[in-house]
């Protein structure tokens, strides 16, 4: 049934939200008769019929609402018809002002007309004018347009007449016109207010609608049968449909107000970029916002080449979010995974442990283990993830187990080495397993008295075809073996030929394994002959060699080796090497076979042993500490190419640890391949559980021909299970997971491929995803259903139940103890306070000290203060200032104990003589350094100016219980001394560098991905490359150390209560050990001292040495020094000369282009303003787009904008906010959390201006005022030298802070240097980083030159190795300033010069080791005048 016009109107009224403003008659009886659509100019004309006239307010409201609703898609017009025109006269007058506005009259004419008196008579409207001139003017101007406007509103007006109004005088007319205008404006105002309210409600409703959209659905439904794999999208297409999971999303607003969404999706065959613009008048944006990474979508659209990304993209017409079935573990009884690698398995595991734990929890697993290679660095995150998911975490590691010593001689005999007979032999076989492979060639030579006296060479028939690998390796073909004798015959003959001689072989365990197994199978009795392994012998007596393979040793011993891997040739070469080795043994005093092992044993024997993988599982809390000790020892004491765990070490700390047999590289698996079952069972006895893994994880053994086939592999399973059963040891099935899902395998392939030396590159990587219970059962079905269930489910759950709950991270802070620390801190604070403020301390000083001491002592923080005080005191005693970082300057106790120079009290004067003081605590002064100079009224002495007005709460929190983080900036050259001093304070075994974990960065991952794809000859589009990069990013690559962090362990505990230890980046030559855990993981458990190295104290020390001026005596408010922060004039140069409007080049904190621009905008003149600028420059979203805009707009000045985090708390408290809320607000804002409703309410109630609230909302991070004050104090001192002692400053700057020198440019005249700088400015965007660094140096050099000083070339006679030296009005650069010349060479030049002058360039090269390139550079620089290429030989030298 067709919809009536009345129903159409109701729908329209509802859509434009106008129904509540219309009376019921209008709503019920109005009609929408039609809508005329003109596509040519996007015009919609609504034809509407009303039962009677609307009030002008409702008319304006209605038309405004309909235009607002459709404005984004059409230019809307309305034509109205009114059925009942009974009140037309009355409404025509009220509509007059609106109708005038619809004409094209000038604003002036419109304004005049609106004031006129009207008379309505029938269908004629009369407009009464003041005079004839006015009448004629209006009549001509309107020209029918007013009639059209009335008719559009539904009026039946046929004529508008302009008449002269003679009925009223001018005064009455003016009054009438004013009344008319007032009424018109009132009606328009009311309509506008209602419309704006409707708009606001609509916007709010849209926001609500957006928040209600939880699932994206735009456009038409997409047929599933049309969906294709993304890898099939290879060219432009009119229409295609794909589905995939979102791995990246970018939603941005365009200048037009529309939005564009860019999705990167993958279906794991490939990836594609999907794009879509929001459509006008649609809620697409809400749907876009419902999308997120990890959601699956189905999309349809046009495939086109995007000119910007130069790749195929889909321009979507339709998109819908879909539910994708995820893998479930549907087994009723779930397994427990005991072998799993995370991203902490270096360049091998992919996911974070939390990803595994989340998956296990979703599958319903009750527990899960983590067993990374050689490390336990995932433990902290594992603990957090397990607690979050309510799952039991089992902590473990896959380590490298080695025997403490590998024997050189087997079956020792009391036999003189010099007179013994030796049989040097070699076997070629069908494979590497003496249990499953066969001997195909046996060759030997007999050695006596240093000579080969006999040979033995036989093939044997294996009765099977050789693999291509064996043929290529041994150069033996099947034809060569067809007529060969049986192995029984060969071995029987061989045993007889050998007699009681001593066997010698290279890697004897392999060859003897085949001989012993062969003798046993043939039944001719076990061999009792002694054995010498030349591989292990060489490793012991040739420790200087990095390799010990047969090829390498043959060259070293001068022995010819042809056709390597043919038994007879290998044997002869080995024999000749062995003869020479015997002479080495004799030289070492080894004369008897039974003495070889004992005489040649050494502490490094573990290095020779072949590592076997082993799984170590923590059973209880004691086991955790023991594992920490094992990990530490393997990384520190027993590291050789990889961390190693000697068996004796494991035995010593085995309590509380369950030992598992690990993977195919474990000892038990290897034994199955190389030894008989009785030996396997004996070896298995050492373990607490035996592991078997799915056949897919052993597939590479078959691929590499180490295992013959699946049948052989199944036999290996049975022997492993038998070894467990015989010893009553549980056998468990483990997954050896390295990634979460099958499709993540590519990321591991890429990482492995990025490591050329990784042995995994030799084979196809096995499928190592995290398996469900049913997957494991299915893959082990060949064992039988019952046995598979036992290994996969029952035994893993039983083993998990034996493991206690273990907590790897402490939940409290353990600080070191220092006897009497509380009393010492209190006494020191008051003693120094009295020394500064007098015995009768001001109440403000007492109150602040007591407030702080109560928190410091009450929370056990005294020792932290005392440690910092000792470190600072030692540095000061040794002549180096210490700068403070962070918020420590907020603590007055820190000031009084000389930890920081920053005084946080309100600005004040102090008399150094009579100790009178005057405080300004009303916020009127920003810094005590800004107070005017003043003399003491009592004694006339110049008053000291102090105080930065910083609340204590910003350091230890509002309750004073936040652990203090005292960061100290020591001189970079003094930092090692400060670090070592902590060893004196606490003991070497109580202090460690804070460890860090370096992961694969996005840029590095991109290189890995591109390299892999190029090597494989694969082309992938950009979206897929981005996905692969994400998969590789975040994987552990190395370890390191915090630049200044020192971890202090209390004397009542040891480091293993918190973390294992290691060397940074496994550098065994490092002088410091680091925490194994990333220091953030234990930040709340142990004290961390931040003893950082910084250039400022080093530069201050050099300036002090050059000038003899104590930096503490420098006036902080020196006017000329302050002047350079707004102008270069105090330096005696102009802005044009140095190309800068300030004089702060090279001044710490104020020399960068970013901060110099801030200085230009703010023009600071005081210390407090510099502190504010420092805060602004170090914050995030504090200056740009925030304070800068406020200052430039004139709304604020530097003094009023938010600069440092403390500003917020202080300002809000001054404005009346309750202190705890002011503190909470500061904490929220400085961390980028914005403002809560209660904060906003309190701020508004206390009349905090709107701009302040907006500024707070924009801030992401804020700098502490104390940190800024400390930095600025150092900066002003250095700036003082720049102004008053220029050459001292420039010599110090170039020596301490500068690098990347362009000496060729620096030695030129000032105009040339200035031109060079100007030229680099013009090309700045194209400069490489190194060029930009050079530009920084040249800016300083230009300034120095403009001030009348110059740089000399390097002088062979005068230049130092590292320091710039002053000579007159010039500087002489050091040798280190030469590009590409390192520290060692720079020092060597000076040492060679001290031995005598350089006679020639050749002599310079010979004595100092300078390259030809460096010599040429020095020559170009003019540093080698008159130095010949070669020395001339004098007659007196002959």
UniProtKB/Swiss-Prot annotation:
Pfam families: DNA_pol3_a_NI, DNA_pol3_a_NII, DNA_pol3_alpha, DNA_pol3_finger, HHH_6, PHP, RNase_T. GO terms for biological process: DNA-templated DNA replication. Coiled coil: none annotated. One of its GO terms (cellular component) is cytoplasm. Its EC number is 2.7.7.7. It catalyses: DNA(n) + a 2'-deoxyribonucleoside 5'-triphosphate = DNA(n+1) + diphosphate. Keywords: Cytoplasm, DNA replication, DNA-directed DNA polymerase, Exonuclease, Hydrolase, Nuclease, Nucleotidyltransferase, Transferase. CDD domains: DEDDh, PHP_PolIIIA_POLC, polC_OBF. Residues 422-578 form the Exonuclease domain. One of its GO terms (molecular function) is DNA-directed DNA polymerase activity. It is found in: Cytoplasm. InterPro entries: DNA_pol3_alpha_NTPase_dom, DNA_pol3_finger, DNA_PolC-like_N_II, DNA_PolC-type_N_I, DnaE2/DnaE/PolC, DNAPol_HHH, DnaQ, Exonuclease_RNaseT/DNA_pol3. Belongs to the DNA polymerase type-C family. PolC subfamily. Required for replicative DNA synthesis. This DNA polymerase also exhibits 3' to 5' exonuclease activity. This is DNA polymerase III PolC-type. It comes from Staphylococcus saprophyticus subsp. saprophyticus (strain ATCC 15305 / DSM 20229 / NCIMB 8711 / NCTC 7292 / S-41).
């Amino acid at each position: 049934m067709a919809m009536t016009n009345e129903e159409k109107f109701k729908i329209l009224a509802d859509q434009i939200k106008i129904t509540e403003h219309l009376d019921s008659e209008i709503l019920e009886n109005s009609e929408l008769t039609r809508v005329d659509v003109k596509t040519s100019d996007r015009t919609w004309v609504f034809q509407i019929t009303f039962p009677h006239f609307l009030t002008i307010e409702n008319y304006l409201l209605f038309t405004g609402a309909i235009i607002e609703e459709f404005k984004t898609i059409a230019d809307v017009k309305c034509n109205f018809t009114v059925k009942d025109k009974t009140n037309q006269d009355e409404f025509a007058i009220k509509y007059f002002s609106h109708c005038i506005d619809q004409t094209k009259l000038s604003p002036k004419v419109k304004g005049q007309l609106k004031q006129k008196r009207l008379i309505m008579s029938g269908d004629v409207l009369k407009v009464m004018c003041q005079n004839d001139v006015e009448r004629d003017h209006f009549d001509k101007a309107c020209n029918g347009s007013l009639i059209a406007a009335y008719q559009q509103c539904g009026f039946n007006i046929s004529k508008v007449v302009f008449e002269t109004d003679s009925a009223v005088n001018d005064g009455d007319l003016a009054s009438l016109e004013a009344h008319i205008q007032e009424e018109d404006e009132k009606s328009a105002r009311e309509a506008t207010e209602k419309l704006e309210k409707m708009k606001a409600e609509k916007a709010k409703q849209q926001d609500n609608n957006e928040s209600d959209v939880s699932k994206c659905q735009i456009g038409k439904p997409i047929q599933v049968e049309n969906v294709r794999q993304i890898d099939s999208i290879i060219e432009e297409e009119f229409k295609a449909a794909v589905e995939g999971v979102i791995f990246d999303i970018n939603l941005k607003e365009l200048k037009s107000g529309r939005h564009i969404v860019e999705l990167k999706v993958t279906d794991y065959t490939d990836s594609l970029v999907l794009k879509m613009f929001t459509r006008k008048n649609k809620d697409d944006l809400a749907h876009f916002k419902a999308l997120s990474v990890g959601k699956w979508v189905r999309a349809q659209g046009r495939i086109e080449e995007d000119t910007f990304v130069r790749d195929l993209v889909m321009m979507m017409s339709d998109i819908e979010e879909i539910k994708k079935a995820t893998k479930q573990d549907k087994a009723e009884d779930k397994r427990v995974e005991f072998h799993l690698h995370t991203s902490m398995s270096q360049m091998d595991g992919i996911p974070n442990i939390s990803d595994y734990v989340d998956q296990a929890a979703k599958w319903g697993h009750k527990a899960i283990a983590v067993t990374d290679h050689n490390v336990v660095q995932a433990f902290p995150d594992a603990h957090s993830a397990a607690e979050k998911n309510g799952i039991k975490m089992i902590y473990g590691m896959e380590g490298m187990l080695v025997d403490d010593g590998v024997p050189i001689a087997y079956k020792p005999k009391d036999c003189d080495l010099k007179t013994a007979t030796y049989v040097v032999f070699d076997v070629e076989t069908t494979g590497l397993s003496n249990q499953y492979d066969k001997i195909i060639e046996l060759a030997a030579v007999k050695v006596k008295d240093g000579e080969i006296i006999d040979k033995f060479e036989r093939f044997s028939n294996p009765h099977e075809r050789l693999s291509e690998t064996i043929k290529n390796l041994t150069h033996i073909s099947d034809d060569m073996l067809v007529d060969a004798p049986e192995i029984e015959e060969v071995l029987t003959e061989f045993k007889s030929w050998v007699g009681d001689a001593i066997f010698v072989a290279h890697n004897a365990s392999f060859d003897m394994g085949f001989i012993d197994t062969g003798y046993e199978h043939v039944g001719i009795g076990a061999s009792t002959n002694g054995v010498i392994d030349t591989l292990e012998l060489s490793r012991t007596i040739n420790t200087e060699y990095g390799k010990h393979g047969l090829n390498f040793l043959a060259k070293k011993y001068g022995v010819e080796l042809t056709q390597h891997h043919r038994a007879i040739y290998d044997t002869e070469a080995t024999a000749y090497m062995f003869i020479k080795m015997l002479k080495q043994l004799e030289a070492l005093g080894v004369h008897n076979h039974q003495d070889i092992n004992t005489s040649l044993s050494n502490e490094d024997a573990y290095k020779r042993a072949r590592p076997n993988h082993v799984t170590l599982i923590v059973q209880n809390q004691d086991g955790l500490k023991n594992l920490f000790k094992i990990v530490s020892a393997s990384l520190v004491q027993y590291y050789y190419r990889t961390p190693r765990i000697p068996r004796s070490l494991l035995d010593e700390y085995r309590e509380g640890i369950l030992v598992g047999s690990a993977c195919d590289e474990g000892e038990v698996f290897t034994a199955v391949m190389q030894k008989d079952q009785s030996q396997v069972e004996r070896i298995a006895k050492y373990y607490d559980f035996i592991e078997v893994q799915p056949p897919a994880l052993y597939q590479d053994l078959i691929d590499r021909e180490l295992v013959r086939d699946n049948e052989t592999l199944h036999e290996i399973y049975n022997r492993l299970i038998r070894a467990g059963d015989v010893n009553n040891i549980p056998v468990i099935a483990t997954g050896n997971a390295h990634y979460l899902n099958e499709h993540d395998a590519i990321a591991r392939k890429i990482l492995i491929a990025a490591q050329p030396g990784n042995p995994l590159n030799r084979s196809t990587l096995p499928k190592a995803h995290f398996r469900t219970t049913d997957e494991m059962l299915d893959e082990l079905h060949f064992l039988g259903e019952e046995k598979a269930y036992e290994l996969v489910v029952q035994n893993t759950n039983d083993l998990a139940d034996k493991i206690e709950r273990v907590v790897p991270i402490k939940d409290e802070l353990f600080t070191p103890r220092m006897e009497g620390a509380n009393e010492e801190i209190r006494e020191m604070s008051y003693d120094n306070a009295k020394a500064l403020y007098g015995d009768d301390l001001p109440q403000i000083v007492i109150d602040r000290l007591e407030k702080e001491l109560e928190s410091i002592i009450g929370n056990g923080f005294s020792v932290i203060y005392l440690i910092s005080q000792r470190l600072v005191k030692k540095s000061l005693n040794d002549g180096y200032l210490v700068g403070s970082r962070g918020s420590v300057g907020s603590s007055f106790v820190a000031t009084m104990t000389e930890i920081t120079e920053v005084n946080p009290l309100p600005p004040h004067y102090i008399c150094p003589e009579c100790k009178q003081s005057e405080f300004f605590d009303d916020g009127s002064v920003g810094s005590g350094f800004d107070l005017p100079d003043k003399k003491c009224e009592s004694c006339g002495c110049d008053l000291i100016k102090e105080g930065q007005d910083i609340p204590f709460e910003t350091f230890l929190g509002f309750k004073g219980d936040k652990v203090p983080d005292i960061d100290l900036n020591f001189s970079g050259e003094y930092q090692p001394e400060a670090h070592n001093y902590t060893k004196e304070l606490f003991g070497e075994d109580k202090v460690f560098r804070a460890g860090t974990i370096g992961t694969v960065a996005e840029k590095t991952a991109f290189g890995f991905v591109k390299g892999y794809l190029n090597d494989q000859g694969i082309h992938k589009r950009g979206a897929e490359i981005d996905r692969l990069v994400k998969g590789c990013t975040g994987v552990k690559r190395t370890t390191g150390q915090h630049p200044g962090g020192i971890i202090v362990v209390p004397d009542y505990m040891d480091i293993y209560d918190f973390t294992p230890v290691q060397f940074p980046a496994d550098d065994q030559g490092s002088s410091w050990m680091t925490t194994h855990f990333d220091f953030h993981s234990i930040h709340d458990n142990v004290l961390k001292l931040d003893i950082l190295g910084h250039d400022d104290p080093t530069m201050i020390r050099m300036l002090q040495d050059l000038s003899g001026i104590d930096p503490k005596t420098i006036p902080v408010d020196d006017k000329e020094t302050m002047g350079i922060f707004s102008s270069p004039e105090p330096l005696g140069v102009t802005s044009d000369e140095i190309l800068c409007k300030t004089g702060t080049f090279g001044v710490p904190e104020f020399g960068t282009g970013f901060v110099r621009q801030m200085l230009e905008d703010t023009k600071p003149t005081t210390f407090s303003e510099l502190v504010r600028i420092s805060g602004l420059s170090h914050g995030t979203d504090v200056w740009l787009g925030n304070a800068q805009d406020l200052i430039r707009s004139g709304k604020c000045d530097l003094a009023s904008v938010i600069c440092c985090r403390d500003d917020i708390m202080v300002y809000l408290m001054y404005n009346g906010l309750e202190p705890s809320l002011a503190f909470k607000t500061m904490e929220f804002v400085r961390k980028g959390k914005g403002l809560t409703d209660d904060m906003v309410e309190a701020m508004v109630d206390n009349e905090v201006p709107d701009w302040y609230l907006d500024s707070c909302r924009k801030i992401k991070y804020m700098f502490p005022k104390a940190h800024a004050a400390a930095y600025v104090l150092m900066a002003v001192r250095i700036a003082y030298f720049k102004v008053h002692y220029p050459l001292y400053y420039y010599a110090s700057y170039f020596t301490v802070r500068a690098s990347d020198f362009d000496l060729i440019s620096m030695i030129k005249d000032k105009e040339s240097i200035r031109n060079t700088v100007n030229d680099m400015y013009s090309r700045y965007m194209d400069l490489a980083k190194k060029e930009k660094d050079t530009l920084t140096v040249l800016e300083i050099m230009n300034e120095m030159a403009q001030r009348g000083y110059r740089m000399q070339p390097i002088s062979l006679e005068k230049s130092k190795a590292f320091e710039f030296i002053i000579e007159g009005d010039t500087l002489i650069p050091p040798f280190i300033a030469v590009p590409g010349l390192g520290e060692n060479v720079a020092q060597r030049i000076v040492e060679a010069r001290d031995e005598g002058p350089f006679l020639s360039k050749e002599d310079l090269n010979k004595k100092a080791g300078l390259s030809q390139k460096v010599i040429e550079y020095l020559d170009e620089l003019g540093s080698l005048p008159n130095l010949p290429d070669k020395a001339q030989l004098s007659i007196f030298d002959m």
